[in-house]
């Protein structure tokens, strides 16, 4: 992700935001921005990891937000569906679990010491 972000920044120096597929990529994008001396571009990601929440708490961090998934809720939903299958019950072919946006304004509500 670091090399990809460096390439993007080289080809698109006026980019204003980077959206990453996960929090680890966001950290790499932030590193690439720092190496390029770019302190204006913001970074968004998906996961809601404890590390990215710590970054969100920093006033000067370019990490602007993450869409938080809940491994706990995902696991509970998976077990519920597995039990339905084992019991021969009907189940949805596709299912979803709610996610939520974390940003600098609401990260304190969720804490930075774990997953939701």
Labelled PLM ranges:
Residues 70-116:
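Hinge/cleft segment of the Venus flytrap/periplasmic-binding protein
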Residues 58-72:
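Short beta-strand elements at the ligand-binding edges of bilobed clamshell
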């Amino acid at each position: 992700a670091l090399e990809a972000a460096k390439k993007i920044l080289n080809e698109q120096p006026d980019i204003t935001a980077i959206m990453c597929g996960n929090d680890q990529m966001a950290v790499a994008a932030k590193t690439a921005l720092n190496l390029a001396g770019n302190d204006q571009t913001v970074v968004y990601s998906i996961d809601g990891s404890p590390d990215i929440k710590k970054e969100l708490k920093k006033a000067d961090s370019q990490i602007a937000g993450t869409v938080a998934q809940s491994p706990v809720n995902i696991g509970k939903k998976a077990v519920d569906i597995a039990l339905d299958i084992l019991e021969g019950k009907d189940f949805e072919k596709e299912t979803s679990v709610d996610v939520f946006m974390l940003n600098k304004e609401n990260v304190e509500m969720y804490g930075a010491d774990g997953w939701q």
